Amino acid sequence: MATGSLRGLAVAGGGESSDSEDDGWEIGYLDRPPQKLKGPLPIEEKNETFKKALTTGDTSLVKELLDSGISVDSSFRYGWTPLMYAASVANVELVRVLLDRGANASFDKDKQTILITACSARGSEEQILKCVELLLSRNADPNVACRRLMTPIMYAARDGHPQVVALLVAHGAEVNIQDENGYTALTWAARQGHKSVVLKLLELGANKTLQTKDGKTPSEIAKRNKHLEIFNLLSLTLNPLEGKLQQLTKEETICKLLTTDSDKEKDHIFSSYTAFGDLEIFLHGLGLEHMTDLLKERDITLRHLLTMRKDEFTQNGITSKDQQKILAALKELEVEEIKFGELPEVAKLEISGDEFLNFLLKLNKQCGHLITAVQNIITELPVNSHKIVLEWASPRNFTSVCEELVSNVEDLNEEVCKLKDLIQKLQNERENDPTHIPLMEEVSTWNSKILKRTAVTVCGFGFLLFICKLTFQRK
């Protein structure tokens, strides 16, 4: 680090504000040449020197001051301890020295823990990861929340640190815990657009269906914040990475995530995810990864797999156990077809007008649903091809199906026009038929109106006479 350069800001982590405007700290972490005590110092001057040593990251001076009797858990003006400050700027050496001297790793100030401060520190992920690892090794609780009910994993997810997230989960952090607004770590990562964190959380078993207090899922939060790639990713029905590390022990998870080749492995996982085709996604989601090579060797596509008969499964070497998994998944993926059998039978000559009208209304409603479905697809499809998360088949396949749809819609339009013309013809013939007897509700003659008015008048006059007679008898 360059001498005299500003390293980070000493502010409360995680967006928590301090209780004092004048906290007594020199804000900033400045690299300066190490200093030594010239002799015994008064207590007040010793505390001030201690602050400066922490601010400048002067590890040797901090050790010397601790040796001279200053408390490792000294409380400064707004309640921060030296360890909390060292964690806030991700100074690994200072954190290690203070912990070795007995600093309390579980300290909190107004529910702001040192672990939360470290997870929201200013610094590289490598430095933050080492600080968090040191604190966890001294039994810092990864599930203690701040005043806003945010836990360390939420801060790490919000700030885009996938390795820190994985380390916290390995030490028992709850992946699906929610803060005061219903946000989970996955929601925070989706909101901030951190794809690597989203993938890691899915791998660790994050629930992408949990909703915030205003009823939004992580995918909807991502869409609202214009992170369309993450929105597409979270909208997938099947996820090959979901829960992949959830069943591992803490030691196995740490070993898997923090090996020397962790970065290469991480990049491989992420790139392989984005390169998965529909078939791979389907198989991984069912735990049938072992079938991938077999199906590819036989040039079996997902469409072919989903339409196979039982004898074809056997011919292609798919075991009965695997067949059951595929068939069970097919039932879940089946799209409910429109049940036109429930519509009234219009072929009968004795059908009533109400039944025929009901048939037309239902038919119109189904068409409306189809229009809405197509409109939704048009809205959700990414404009640019590079934003598509999964590999798609050749666009020609989609185009040919769309052309068939257009042709069917044109045929439907033609048939509906014929039906309309036929109904119009029947209506005209009926109106011009001299033998046609109008419905009673259509007849409204002058005589009937006079009769109704007369009846009402007579009844009213009779009621008036009855009232007058009753009044006269009482008198």
Swiss-Prot record:
Domain of life: Eukaryota
BP-aspect Gene Ontology terms: cell differentiation; male meiotic nuclear division; regulatory ncRNA-mediated gene silencing; spermatogenesis; transposable element silencing
Residues spanning the membrane: none
GO CC, any one term: pi-body
Region described as Disordered: spans on this chain: 1-38
Ranges for the ANK repeats: 45-74, 78-107, 110-144, 148-177, 181-210, 214-243
Subcellular locations according to the entry: Cytoplasm
Alphabetic keyword roster: ANK repeat, Cytoplasm, Developmental protein, Differentiation, Meiosis, Phosphoprotein, Repeat, RNA-mediated gene silencing, Spermatogenesis
Ranges of residues in domain SAM: 272-334
Keyword tRNA processing: no
Modified positions (Phosphoserine) in chain numbering: 17-18, 20
Subunit structure: Interacts with DDX4, PIWIL1, RANBP9 and TDRD1.
Stated role: Plays a central role during spermatogenesis by repressing transposable elements and preventing their mobilization, which is essential for the germline integrity. Acts via the piRNA metabolic process, which mediates the repression of transposable elements during meiosis by forming complexes composed of piRNAs and Piwi proteins and governs the methylation and subsequent repression of transposons. Its association with pi-bodies suggests a participation in the primary piRNAs metabolic process.
Protein name: Ankyrin repeat, SAM and basic leucine zipper domain-containing protein 1
Gene giving rise to this polypeptide: ASZ1
